[in-house]
Amino acid sequence: IDCIARTNWRITEKLGASSAHIRGTNICFSETFGGFGWNLTPQEMKNKTDEQFVQGVNMLVPHAFFYSIDGMRKTESPPSLFFQNGYWKYFNLYANYVRRLSYVGRAGKPLTDVAVCYPLKTSWARFMPLDRYDLKKLDEQILEIHSALISARLDYDFLDDVAFSSCSANGG
């Protein structure tokens, strides 16, 4: 997953985590903070990290640690989280926090009681390059469901039609 924008409550992390669960892997990683800009603060780093881990990310790859920020590198994909950053001397505190979250996030096995159909083939069928109203409406509905479930603290997985075809219901 790439988290290279400051948007909140996007479904990308949940899609990645759901995919990892479906495929039986215990790692869902996100490259994060590239393009956030030089005004990225430790508090924003923690908030974005928490938001991603709540949605199932369990390994974070911070972007980036530039050896040099000479020339275009300073503005290519800021910030550098390395020694050029004023918060560098505190980075170990953040890294230890992420390390602990990652350990806990991978130590267990996900138990989700809710599945949300992710209509991938429907999206493909409705795609019209010049008229994206149907897809925009579908995106808004999925984001609304996602936000409601996360706000209610209900864990869930997105399942596409292929994943649904191999599911079974147990105990009700």
Predicted features, each with a name:
Residues I1-G172:
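Carbohydrate-binding surfaces of carbohydrate-active enzymes
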